[in-house]
């Protein structure tokens, strides 16, 4: 079973910055047993990435809803995502780390939303106007901003 210390050490050894934007895509099944399961992994990653002002971004796509024209693609009252367990947990997971609360801030892109954890003002600014993006990777959208702001993609 992986502990917080194991994962923090591995991230540090890989050179994952703690003051940048990190887009994390995960397969919880591929990761294996983690202390605290899915919510434990979220807490571990939030603590590591936000320690020096970074933002942790987790895709929470809902594009699968396009198959049912009677359903909205993004329902802000639902925790539905079509890309796995960790993204679904992230939609509603609030982390409490060292006495500080980290709430998820979900972008409003109709098919390619993401949850962002970190400084509340920075997170809200990062996802602002996402619903106006003309594509899932528009330059002004969350995915388009990632390279422009020196962000990283972490496949876990």
Short names for language-model regions:
Residues 1-6:
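N- or domain-start disorder-to-order transition segments that initiate the globular core
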Residues 7-16:
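A short, well-ordered alpha-helical element
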Residues 12, 43-47, 88, 144:
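Surface-exposed alpha-helical segments enriched in charged/polar residues
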Residues 15-71:
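N-terminal active-site beta-alpha-beta segment that forms phosphate/nucleotide-binding
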Residues 66-156:
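Internal, conserved structured core segments that host functional sites
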């Amino acid at each position: 079973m992986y502990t917080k210390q194991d994962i923090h050490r591995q991230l540090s050894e890989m050179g994952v910055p703690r003051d940048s934007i990190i887009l994390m895509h995960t397969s919880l099944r591929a990761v294996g047993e983690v202390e605290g399961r899915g919510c434990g992994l979220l807490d571990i990653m939030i603590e590591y990435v936000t320690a020096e002002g970074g933002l942790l971004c987790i895709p929470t796509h809902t594009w699968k809803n396009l198959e049912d024209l009677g359903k909205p693609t993004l329902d802000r009252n639902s925790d539905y995502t079509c890309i796995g367990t960790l993204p679904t947990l992230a939609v509603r997971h609030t982390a409490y780390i060292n006495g500080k609360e980290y709430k998820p801030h979900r972008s409003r892109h109709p098919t390619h939303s993401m949850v962002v954890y970190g400084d509340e003002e920075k997170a809200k600014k990062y996802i602002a106007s996402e619903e106006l993006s003309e594509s899932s990777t528009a330059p002004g959208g969350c995915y388009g901003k990632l390279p422009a702001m020196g962000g990283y993609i972490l496949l876990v």
